[in-house]
């Protein structure tokens, strides 16, 4: 060191310390790697100082003492954040560059600057056993990979000073980052570098002659030296443990392919670029079996690469300056590239899918965003996509960080290949080259990807096209955000995405020819998997559960029209009737109506205890599901819990609940009268339409085979199908179900509805619960593993027959929607061998008291219930038979508590009873406003739609029931059958009642068909005893006379008579200014078989009187003067009690007696409630003969519609 420092005696003490540090670094890091005979440490340190001073550009008297020399090992170990360092930048220059970079991409910050001095040897990694065709900076402490904008093969093995560089670390512990060498390195060693071309340069063969040589028969192993312009630089490939890359040299119209496969030459790929002229010596001629014996050139151990440069530039500086390049191919702009050929084709399997050819272009741009590093997707210039998936994965992203400028050659341009990617996407194939022309000055996180990621494996295994791959990446990102890691492990995300792709694409659409990579790299004209692409296919969007809920609520509330919710009689309703009619409404939308493109919904089915429903959920939200089967069977298996499913067809239902105080229908356009509104959004699903992406662990082999047979289960290939089959197989063979347990086999007899039950006598706490009655098929059994839903063993059938009561409380209420009478279940208690935990306990009888109840068993939250796919022969019993609506109406032996099935034809929300408080407030998390919600369902017979029964439900007594909308098939359990004073049968709910929807016409049967018209009835038949429960029918007859006609204006608030502009109520006075017009007429209708009294309400009176709109409005104005007019039949004329001589009364009397009113009429009527009366005796004259006949009471009907034709 003294010898070295003697050359710098005039320097300051600070300079001396810095020089000492340089000497120690040279002695420790670089001297051990050099030949001891070549250089002394002092001479090498002297050369380092000179190169540093020259790089700084300052006076030789100044040294960069602020820069600390750093070794490679220190850089890797200590530098945990990205940084940059430059010897030639001033502070002002750095700030200007940083500001300019941040203005280009405002979301990123510039790389922080560190004053570090980096020196090392450039090598290709062979010394470290890491020869992967990359440059590395090496010293005695280790090596780190690096990237350069331009490099020369003459730099290999030389000691270099790196003036300007960026270091990008990895976040993984123990992993090294990489260097970005911004400026060319400066050679420190000055030894002469001799160039061995490996052959005489005077024998350089042109590309045209080389192509002719390969075309004609020649001996293999012939060595030639070829010079030409590089037109293709292929990626470095690893095939069967061997690395190689492809170069294509061109000259004029001729080209020749070179395969570089020697380990020591693989760094050449970093030294050449498209457009550069090179010579390569000692190339051998060989044949490729993959190309049917086609001859190509390959390198040998003696081959050398030499760039073509003028001779006068051969000097020391030539080694570190940029190589001379000839102009590259014309670089296309985005506007030029979008002018793609207009011709396209169609897929044979789907004529709606267009297939277009891609265009090969060159492009230059700036990386603005990393869309998906694992998928190799980037964004250029804010609008163009770049995909590198069809090339081998580059380490560290190939330096493609936001802000980097790149040059692309021989890339494929596609336009609108996918709806989930930029419109214009550039694709790099095995013939494309990606060259960085300027490193990014911005700080961005390094996203490290595996060399062979799951997405790339799927791409290669299934030979996907560009459009399919973009859709696969879209699914992979969506699944990772919404389902991982709770339901889908991170390493299985791509597998799930692949299954989704299989579900969307048909087998014919996915199958392509086997790839030949040598043909893709070498053969002309070029053809590869990217040469043809589908336009925007697959186009199915994968929505999250929250996205669907938000869209549904926004769509329904924004399109809310209050007049559309009301019937035609809305102008005649009082405020109480109007507001009651607005309390509830529902909207049904199909999933395909949410978007012009197909929609998919992906989620996990889980049982929810708070609402006792099946839910579809992901990380964003959860959505209640009303699940039915196509055969209207209610038997939803417990194995669906935990299944990852894809929903392609379903109906979105939103039930709206509003509290309003509109004075009249004229105020419906004023939303201020709406005091409260909220909604319930849920899905109507048909289980047969679900695609099982990942089955639950308890899904049995028999169920999976049944689904596969009917084509409803997703079939996947390769590893996906193997996992599906293994997951669907019987769980008895699974090795991970090793917990000891006990089980009990039972068949469910019946179950009660979910209600709030007292937990203990000491507190007033109540919780949800329900009770079931079951018959034990066998005794309690011990297991060494969890049997789940495997086949029933013989030992489980011993000792059965006991009837027990099963009590479900708290979180156990979640089993309610999957427990069905008549089905067999296995109850399992894990982690115990005590059979007593599943034995039902009874109450001991004392004092001669007879015990009527069965032994009971309270289920624990950790216990599991599994539906068994088959029933044992000794326990088979049909589910309790349900009555039909006809049997409920007509059966004389019907019990007081009945269960029946039918179809909802009407739902009416009953008027709110302000005096009565709700018995039990709803505990559903979204149903806090469903207090005092009582509805009347009109349920019609499935076989005879004319037979109907009213069911009154108090929905505030338990959990809210989903799906009670018109057209739904349902089963009503445990309701009380009652007979009114008018001898009409109706039903009302009990605390143990429950309603289960078993069929949804809009889901299982496609678009809902128009309801069949009511049957045509004769009045005599309708009045008979056998048809008394036909509620709605069509009748044709003659209007004999009008019995009464009442026209009135009443106050919409209190119902009193309204005269002109004031309400007639005086005690207490009413100051309302809103009035509604009401009309009612009662006529005698006769059809030859009988007669009926038909009532016409406000909206149908006008049609009965045959008045047009102007006449009807004028009549209303005249009536408003008096407020009330009523005429009725007395003898053969019509009169009025108040003023029979009034002009209005005389007009109405004349009108009601006219032939325009007493005419043939065709009406649809609903039967009114009427008491059973005695027959009346009347005198009937036939000529001179008088008869006394017995006439039954007239049939009372309410007109619903007057048919004009």
Curated annotation (Swiss-Prot):
Residue ranges crossing the lipid bilayer per the database entry: none
Molecular function as annotated in GO: single-stranded DNA binding; telomeric DNA binding
UniProt subunit comment: Component of the CST complex.
Pfam families named in the record: CTC1
Cell compartment(s), UniProt: Nucleus; Chromosome, Telomere
One Gene Ontology term from the biological process aspect of the record: telomere maintenance via telomere lengthening
Entry superkingdom: Eukaryota
Keywords: Chromosome, DNA-binding, Nucleus, Telomere
Compositionally biased region (Low complexity): 327-340
Region (Disordered): 303-349
GO cellular component, one term: CST complex
InterPro entries referenced in this protein's UniProt entry, alphabetically: CTC1, CTC1-like
Family to which the UniProt record says this protein belongs: Belongs to the CTC1 family.
Name of the protein this chain belongs to: CST complex subunit CTC1
Protein role: Component of the CST complex proposed to act as a specialized replication factor promoting DNA replication under conditions of replication stress or natural replication barriers such as the telomere duplex. The CST complex binds single-stranded DNA with high affinity in a sequence-independent manner, while isolated subunits bind DNA with low affinity by themselves. Initially the CST complex has been proposed to protect telomeres from DNA degradation. However, the CST complex has been shown to be involved in several aspects of telomere replication.
Gene (UniProt): ctc1
Coarse class of the protein's main subcellular location: nucleus
């Amino acid at each position: 060191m003294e010898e070295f420092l003697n050359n710098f005696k005039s320097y300051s003490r600070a300079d001396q310390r810095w020089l000492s540090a340089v000497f120690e670094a040279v002695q420790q890091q670089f001297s051990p790697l050099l030949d001891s005979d070549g250089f002394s440490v002092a001479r090498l340190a002297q050369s380092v100082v000179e190169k540093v001073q020259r790089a700084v550009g300052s006076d030789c008297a100044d040294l960069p003492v602020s820069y600390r020399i750093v070794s490679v090992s220190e850089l890797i170990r200590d530098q945990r954040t990205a940084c940059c360092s430059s010897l030639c930048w001033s502070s002002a220059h750095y700030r200007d560059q940083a500001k300019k970079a941040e203005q280009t991409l405002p979301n990123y910050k510039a790389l922080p600057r560190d004053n570090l001095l980096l020196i090392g040897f450039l090598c290709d990694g062979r010394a470290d056993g890491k020869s992967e065709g990359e440059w590395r900076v090496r010293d005695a402490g280790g090596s780190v990979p690096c990237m350069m904008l331009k490099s020369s093969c003459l730099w290999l093995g030389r000691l270099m000073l790196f003036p300007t560089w960026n270091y990008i670390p990895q976040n993984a512990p123990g992993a090294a980052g990489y260097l970005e060498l911004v400026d060319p390195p400066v050679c420190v060693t000055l030894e002469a570098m001799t160039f061995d071309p490996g052959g005489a340069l005077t024998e350089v063969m042109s590309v045209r002659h080389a192509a002719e040589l390969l075309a004609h028969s020649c001996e293999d192993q012939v060595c030639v030296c070829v010079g030409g312009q590089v037109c293709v630089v292929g990626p470095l490939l690893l095939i069967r443990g061997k690395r190689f890359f492809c170069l294509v040299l061109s000259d004029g119209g001729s080209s020749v392919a070179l395969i570089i496969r020697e380990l020591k030459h693989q760094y050449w790929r970093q030294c050449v670029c498209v457009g550069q002229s090179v010579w390569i010596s000692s190339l051998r001629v060989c044949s490729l079996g993959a190309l049917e014996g086609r001859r190509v050139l390959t390198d040998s151990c003696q081959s050398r690469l030499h760039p073509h440069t003028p001779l006068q530039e051969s000097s020391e500086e030539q080694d570190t300056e940029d190589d001379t390049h000839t102009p590259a191919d014309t670089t296309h702009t985005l506007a030029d590239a979008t002018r793609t050929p207009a011709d396209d084709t169609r897929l044979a399997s789907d004529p709606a899918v267009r297939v277009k050819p891609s265009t090969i272009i060159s492009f230059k741009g700036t990386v603005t965003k990393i869309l998906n590093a694992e998928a190799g997707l980037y964004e250029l210039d804010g609008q163009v996509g770049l995909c590198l998936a069809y090339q081998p994965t580059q380490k560290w992203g190939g330096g493609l960080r936001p802000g980097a400028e790149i040059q692309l050659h021989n890339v494929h341009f596609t336009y609108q290949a996918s709806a989930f990617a930029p419109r214009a996407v550039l694709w790099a194939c095995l013939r494309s080259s990606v060259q960085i022309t300027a490193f990014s000055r911005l700080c961005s996180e390094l996203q490290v990807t595996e060399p062979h990621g799951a997405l790339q494996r799927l791409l290669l295994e299934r030979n996907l096209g560009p459009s399919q791959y973009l859709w696969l990446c879209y699914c992979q990102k969506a699944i990772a955000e919404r389902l991982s890691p709770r339901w889908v492990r991170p390493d299985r995300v791509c597998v799930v995405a692949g299954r989704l792709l299989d579900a969307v694409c048909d087998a014919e659409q996915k199958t392509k020819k086997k790839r030949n990579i040598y043909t893709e790299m070498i053969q002309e004209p070029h053809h590869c998997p990217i040469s043809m692409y589908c336009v925007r296919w697959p186009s199915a969007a994968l929505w999250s559960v929250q996205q669907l809920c938000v869209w549904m609520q926004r769509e329904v509330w924004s399109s809310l029209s209050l007049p559309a919710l009301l019937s035609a009689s809305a102008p005649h309703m009082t405020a109480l009737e109007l507001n009651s009619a607005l309390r509830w409404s529902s909207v049904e939308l199909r999933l395909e109506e949410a978007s012009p493109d197909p929609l998919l919904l992906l989620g996990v089915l889980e049982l929810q205890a708070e609402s006792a429903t099946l839910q579809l959920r992901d990380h964003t939200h959860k959505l209640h599901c009303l699940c039915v089967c196509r055969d209207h069977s209610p038997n939803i298996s417990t194995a669906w819990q935990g299944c990852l499913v894809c929903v392609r067809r379903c109906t979105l239902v939103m039930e709206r609940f509003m509290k309003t105080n509109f004075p009249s229908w004229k105020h419906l356009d004023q939303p201020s009268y709406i005091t409260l509104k909220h909604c319930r959004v849920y899905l109507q699903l048909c289980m047969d339409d679900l695609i099982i992406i990942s089955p639950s662990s308890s899904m049995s082999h028999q169920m999976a085979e049944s689904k596969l047979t009917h084509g409803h289960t997703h079939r996947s290939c390769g590893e996906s199908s193997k996992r599906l089959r293994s997951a669907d197989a019987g769980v008895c063979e699974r090795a991970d179900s090793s917990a000891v347990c006990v089980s009990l086999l039972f068949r469910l007899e019946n179950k009660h509805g979910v209600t709030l039950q007292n937990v203990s006598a000491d507190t007033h706490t109540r919780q949800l619960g329900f009770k079931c009655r079951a018959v034990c098929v066998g005794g309690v059994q011990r297991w060494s593993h969890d049997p789940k839903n495997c086949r029933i063993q013989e030992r489980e059938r011993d000792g059965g027959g006991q009837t027990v009561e099963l009590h479900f409380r708290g979180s156990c209420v979640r089993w309610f929607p999957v427990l069905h009478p008549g089905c067999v279940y296995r109850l399992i208690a894990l982690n115990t061998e005590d059979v007593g935990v599943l034995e039902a306990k009874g109450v001991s009888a004392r004092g001669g008291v007879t015990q009527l109840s069965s032994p009971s068993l309270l289920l624990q939250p950790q216990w599991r219930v599994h539906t068994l796919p088959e029933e044992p022969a000794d326990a088979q019993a049909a589910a309790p038979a349900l009555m039909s609506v006809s049997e409920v109406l007509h059966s004389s032996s019907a019990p007081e508590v009945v269960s029946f099935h039918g179809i909802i034809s009407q739902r009416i929300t009953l008027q709110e009873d302000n005096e009565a408080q709700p018995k039990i407030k709803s505990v559903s998390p979204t149903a806090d406003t469903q207090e005092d919600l009582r509805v009347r369902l009109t349920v019609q017979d499935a076989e005879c739609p004319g037979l109907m029964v009213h069911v009154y439900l108090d929905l505030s007594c338990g959990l809210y029931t989903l799906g009670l909308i018109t057209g739904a098939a349902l089963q009503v359990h445990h309701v009380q059958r009652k007979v009114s004073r008018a001898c009409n049968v109706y039903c009302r709910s009990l605390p143990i009642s429950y309603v289960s929807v078993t069929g949804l016409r809009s889901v299982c049967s496609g678009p809902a068909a128009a309801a069949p018209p009511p049957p045509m009835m004769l009045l005599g038949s309708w009045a008979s005893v056998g048809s008394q429960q036909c509620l709605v029918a069509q009748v044709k007859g003659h209007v004999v006379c009008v019995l009464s006609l009442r026209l009135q204006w009443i106050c919409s608030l209190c119902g009193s008579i309204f005269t002109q502009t004031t309400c007639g109520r005086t005690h207490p006075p009413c100051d309302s200014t809103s009035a509604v017009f009401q009309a009612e007429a009662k006529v005698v209708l006769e059809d030859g078989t009988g007669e009926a009294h038909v009532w016409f309400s406000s909206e149908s009176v006008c049609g009965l009187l045959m008045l047009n709109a102007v006449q009807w409005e004028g009549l209303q104005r005249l009536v408003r003067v008096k407020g009330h007019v009523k005429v009725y039949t007395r003898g053969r004329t019509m009169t009025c009690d108040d003023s029979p001589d009034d002009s209005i009364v005389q007009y109405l009397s004349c009108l009601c007696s006219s032939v325009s009113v007493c005419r043939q009429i065709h009406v649809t009527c609903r039967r009114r409630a009427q008491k059973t009366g005695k027959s009346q005796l009347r005198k009937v004259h036939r000529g001179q003969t008088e008869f006394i006949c017995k006439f039954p009471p007239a049939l009372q009907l309410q007109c619903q519609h007057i048919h004009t034709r």
